[in-house]
Amino acid sequence: MGKISVAEIKELMKSTGVGMMDCKKALEANDGDMDKAIEFLREKGLATQAKKSSRAAAEGIVTAVVEGNVGVLLEVNTETDFAANTDDIKNFVNAVANTIIKQNPADVEALKAMTIDGGTATVADVLTELAGMKIRENIVIRRFVRMEGVLASYIHNGGSIGVMVKLDTELSADKVAVIGKDVAMQSAALNAPYIRREDVPAEVLEKEKEIILAQMAEDPKMSSKPEQVKTKIAEGKVGKYYSENCLLEQAFVKDTTGKLSVQGYVDAEAKALGGTIKVVDVIRYERGEGVEKKEDNLADEVAKMMNK
């Protein structure tokens, strides 16, 4: 048979939802026969995966792996928590994390084109086979961050939340490991949007001040107070905003007195170790955050089954 045309490839892509190169290969392998090409893709699990890819994947695993001075925080989503807890998914996630550590991809698409760690196939091919032939659910490599330096991590509840912390210190990584993990746990628990007050955008702070002043103007108790007192109260409210929204100014969750901030904890531990520690970066992933998850009720499920 002659060369496969672009029109034929587009037709197969439209009918199956499979990518261009896979459709081209399927047509070439079957002498341009469209029906056989579709069957070929189904046998490979590609057509099945294409149909599944439209379904919301909001469950899954967040994992963190640190090897020496290189670490990765990775989120892989599945449709159900049952699938996320299978050995197949866990092994895949670990292999992908190690691929990121060793090969340093620029983004998810670059990652998919790489040979998976410990195997011979690409990450994309392994993902397709896993989704189409084994798990039979939509599986999505959603995001990752690769960091270098003195790192610590914390994974909450088997992969529902993951945090990676980068520290600047002259102390060895093993000496500051517990401190870094404690900071990561703090982030996991209270999810501060900023590390320190300097990180709060000027427009966000200005808006917060406007809200504070508006609240004070509506409070009848404030009308009789001197301007100096009002200013002090407003400053106190801004300080409270910082203590709630800036990680290092939050009350340290492990301190039972409620008087020690996260920064105070880090400084005290650094002094005890004879060095300095600065929290440089904190990345927090929460499984499925921002992914729209359709909630089906029982009646809908029964109706779907009856209409099949």
Report the location of each language-model feature.
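N-terminal assembly/interaction segments in proteins that build large macromolecular machines
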Residues: 2-308
